[in-house]
């Protein structure tokens, strides 16, 4: 390896920049499903529920294979593991572009894509940020904000590719993005610890803490961790129920598709700004204050969506990207920092891994649940009202947990 690359490998700013670029690709991947949902339905005639089930397989398979990713990381290191996952992900998207049936779509995009998408997942990047930086929430925000820019840039570009060619060509473009951006950055920069600061091997007495069964036992035995687990399940469920149907919702409310896509793409920029702002806020004022602000904005977002079809003008919709970002952009950063405060350090990796499994399950369940409700009712208002009730519950639970952590003197 050239000497200048070896120097870059140990420069924290370079690690943060690499994380930002990898999350840019993640934003293009995750943020674009709302666009593919509409395009695949129009091309194939499959129902929204059928297509959304592919996203469910994608997220759930990624969550269920997270322990394998952790084992591979322990055995071979993050750089080799993430590089290998990138190749699997690119293969999955390439095969998805050839899918001619829902089952083929589930196997390619869902299973291979879901497993491989961990190559640019926030879990590993947030772990890197926590080990490399003294202000971890700010570092996490800098990395995670790349996904917002990725969504902002990718949605208009992918829409043009879909209109000029097809959704299949757009999936091939995402596969190329992963190979060109994620693969080299993961292989070069994604070391879990700075040189010379690697943790010592665990003592025999702590090996059991790395077991999934021990993690489940720790969660079951602690009321605080049980509530944290519930929040990890419900929060991504509500976010992705909304996020996967944004374009369809705005079109149903009477907005032209190009305007709807532009509005959703704008959330990429507002998420970028929101994550940076919340990272600094968490480091400065703690997770309770940040969580309360997030809760108010999330509820306001649902209120706006419910009111929009009833209004004579669509002008209030232009507040949506700002409200949506304040209400939802900081979820991963908040949860990671809450976990660092509430989980015993001796068992952190295993317990937080179980939390991320629940998080992935919530991501998997949200889109098909929303799609099934919309398909069954033929409308968006009743499903959105139900999502709003769940959203209110889990935000209240998180704020209570955060205040409890603050009373124990933690931030």
Residue ranges and their predicted role:
Residues 40-41, 72-73, 156-165, 250-251, ...:
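Interfacial helix-cap and linker-helix signal at transmembrane-aqueous boundaries
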Residues 65-77, 274-287, 374-375:
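Helix-to-loop junctions at the C-terminal end of transmembrane segments
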Residues 109-145:
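Cytoplasmic helix-loop-helix junction between adjacent transmembrane helices
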Residues 143-194:
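Helix-loop-helix hairpin linking two adjacent transmembrane segments in secondary transporters
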Residues 267, 271, 284-338:
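C-terminal transmembrane helical hairpin of 12-TM major facilitator-type secondary transporters
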